Amino acid sequence: MYTRYSYSPTLGKTYVYDNKYFKNLGAVIKNAKRKKHLEEHEHEERNLDSLDKYLVAEDPFLGPGKNQKLTLFKEIRSVKPDTMKLVVNWSGREFLRETWTRFMEDSFPIVNDQEIMDVFLSVNMRPTKPNRCYRFLAQHALRCDPDYIPHEVIRIVEPSYVGSNNEYRISLAKKYGGCPVMNLHAEYTNSFEDFITNVIWENFYKPIVYVGTDSAEEEEILLEVSLIFKIKEFAPDAPLYTGPAY
């Protein structure tokens, strides 16, 4: 027990630090890294300043060009709980089916020169029974081996929930996409199968698509599978009309 007369070993060894001259080592390192990251970010932004004069659509489907819809087939599929069913498989019976339910929009037969900028596969899903409360799920793959044979039914593993209007839309464009066609209507009219094989799949990806639901019961889904062409129309050499409005 120490008294005021006892010798204290701490006497003469007490220091007072002024925080003005000392900083936390972790804060110093973090601040240096933060400054370096900001400098690198500013340098990257300066390199992209030249792109500010261009405009792009957040969703390529809503970008410039004319959308032309080709409905391939409509049918009802039964899906069991916790599973997803293969609904689009171009290397199997889906493409080799004997009858195709084809519906072409009236505006599709374009006879002028045009270019297919992108092709979207659209799968529209609707419940066949009223008063059902569940959401649709979907998965797809684009770069499959030509010899790959997908399973008819798979387990649900990290699927995507289908968004608004219960429509699942996939862009099939390759990296340097685009497919110039001189007369799209003639190519389609001559032979539908040749048009799909020689024009579309030579320039765009072949997808496989699985669909399902998060319902705990077996559900019947009405499917409408379509190809939507994003077409770039070339401007005519001379205006069709002349006047103050043009």
Swiss-Prot record:
Keywords for this protein: Viral occlusion body
InterPro entries noted in UniProt: Polyhedrin
Entry keyword annotation includes rRNA processing: no
Cellular component GO terms held in the UniProt record: viral occlusion body
One example GO MF annotation: structural molecule activity
Superkingdom in the source lineage: Viruses
Keyword Cell membrane: no
Family: Belongs to the polyhedrin family.
Purpose of the protein: Major component of the virus occlusion bodies, which are large proteinaceous structures (polyhedra), that protect the virus from the outside environment for extended periods until they are ingested by insect larvae.
Name under which the protein is recorded: Polyhedrin
Native organism: Heliothis zea nuclear polyhedrosis virus (HzSNPV)
